[in-house]
Design a protein with these regions (language model features):
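A short hydrophobic beta-strand element within the catalytic core of glycosyltransferases
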Residues: 256-257
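Conserved acidic donor-binding segment of nucleotide-sugar-dependent glycosyltransferases
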Residues: 293-304, 312-318
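Aromatic "clamp/platform" in nucleotide-sugar-dependent glycosyltransferases that forms part
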Residues: 261
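A charged, aromatic-enriched C-terminal amphipathic alpha-helix characteristic of glycosyltransferases
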Residues: 315-357
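Conserved catalytic-core segment of nucleotide-activated headgroup transferases in glycan assembly
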Residues: 67, 167-170, 182-240
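Extended catalytic core of nucleotide-activated donor transferases of GT-like folds
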Residues: 51-54, 63-154, 163
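Short hydrophobic beta-strand element within catalytic cores of glycosyltransferases
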Residues: 278-281
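Short alpha-helical segment that forms part of, or immediately flanks, the ligand-binding pocket
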Residues: 247, 270-274, 285-289
Length: 364
């Protein structure tokens, strides 16, 4: 029997049987054939430039990432920028032209992306594409009772730590997963020849207690510390060090100090551990599952004990190097860039396939 669109259900079954999924969510002029959820082709991901470091590591995967750019370079519309050495798979799209482009899925990275940006620049048919939302942060309003702004169970929620997933109220959705950080192995290794600690936090004073400004301000009275990051010059810091130069810069310091009370596990911490640097941190959020006290760093909620430990690291470079070697082993195992991009590509593909299988079910 010859199948044609006029055969209705039989024609649809024939398409499914042959592994072809037809995207009905788009108007005829924008329709695209997907073979098994496009499992065989190179994916086209649309997202915004929100966190440069995260986007850089995400771009190490085997897919293409499209990001919008506008004339004012407003939040999320910076394009590639000049800070990170993005490869050719990070592609700028004029914000006004986004609605005319073909993508396999949409990745939200902030409340603004989800509540405002998508409605400003995406066509209606694009807003029905497979969608994911990566939540980079811990809950802000309340540590346990904050309902996430993204409440659509059809959108895949991705948390960057298990602590974040535990604390956010995701509305009971089962469409939630965790993809832990991944960073590249740096070309430099830990030296530790500067007998001081290094702190890497943007706008630490302006962000207050969350980023531990008061903790840092107290500790630096007792321990030699340097501070770098955007907006730190007025807080006694050295200013910003661009990400490509960061591993070389921090590798000379004896240890990395993270005074942050309540945020996600920092990429700067992952990068420091990957160089073989010991990390000193508060025993909060995801840090307690990664840093083992006096094995690969120092971790505690007692600031006096941390001060004592940091001064011991200053006095004993051999001990600092031993802790740093263990930190590198942990980082290599836990924060592999290969595992990270594989997790993301699998999540993209599974989300796309699930979307089209559901949308093209012969039983609907």
């Amino acid at each position: 029997m010859r199948f044609s669109p006029s055969n209705g259900l039989m024609y649809k079954r024939a398409l499914v049987a042959n592994g072809i999924v037809f995207d009905k969510a788009r108007p005829v002029s924008h329709q695209r054939l997907h073979m098994n959820g496009n499992n065989s082709g190179r994916l086209r991901i649309f997202t915004w430039h929100i966190h440069g470091s995260y986007l850089y590591y995400l771009s190490k995967g085997n897919y293409d990432i499209f990001i919008p750019v506008n004339g004012t370079r407003s939040e999320g519309y910076y394009g590639r920028g000049e800070t990170f050495p993005f490869g050719p798979n990070v592609i700028e799209v004029d914000a006004a032209d986004v609605r005319n482009k073909e993508f396999d899925c949409i990745l939200f990275q902030s409340e603004r992306n989800y509540l405002i940006d998508q409605h400003d620049i995406l066509a209606d048919w694009q807003k029905r594409l497979p969608r994911l939302y990566v939540e980079h942060n811990t809950p802000v309003q309340h540590p346990t009772n904050s309902r996430h702004v993204m409440t659509d169970p059809a959108v895949k929620m991705v948390h960057v730590t298990h602590f974040n997933k535990l604390m956010w109220d995701n509305g009971g959705s089962r469409n939630v997963c965790v993809i832990e950080h991944g960073v590249c192995i740096p070309e430099v290794s830990y030296r530790g020849d500067i007998p001081r600690g290094i702190v890497v936090i943007n706008h630490i004073e302006q962000r207050g207690r969350i980023t531990g400004w008061d903790v840092f301000d107290e500790v630096r009275k007792h321990v030699p510390l340097d501070l770098i990051g955007m907006g730190t010059s007025g807080s006694g810091g050295l200013g910003e060090v661009l990400n490509p130069q960061l591993p070389e810069f921090i590798s000379h310091y004896r240890f990395f100090f993270n005074p942050i009370r309540y945020t996600s596990f920092g990429l700067a911490v992952c990068e420091a551990m990957m160089t073989g640097m010991p990390v000193v941190a508060l025993a909060t959020t995801e840090y307690v599952t990664v840093i083992k006290d006096r094995e690969c760093g120092l971790i505690d909620t007692n600031i006096d004990r941390l001060i004592e430990g940091m001064n011991n690291l200053i006095a004993d470079p051999v001990w600092a190097r031993q802790l740093g070697e263990q930190a590198r082993e942990v980082a290599t195992s836990k924060f592999s860039i290969t595992r990270f991009v594989t997790d993301w590509e699998n999540t993209f593909r599974q989300t796309i396939q699930h979307n089209y299988e559901k949308g093209n079910s012969i039983y609907q």
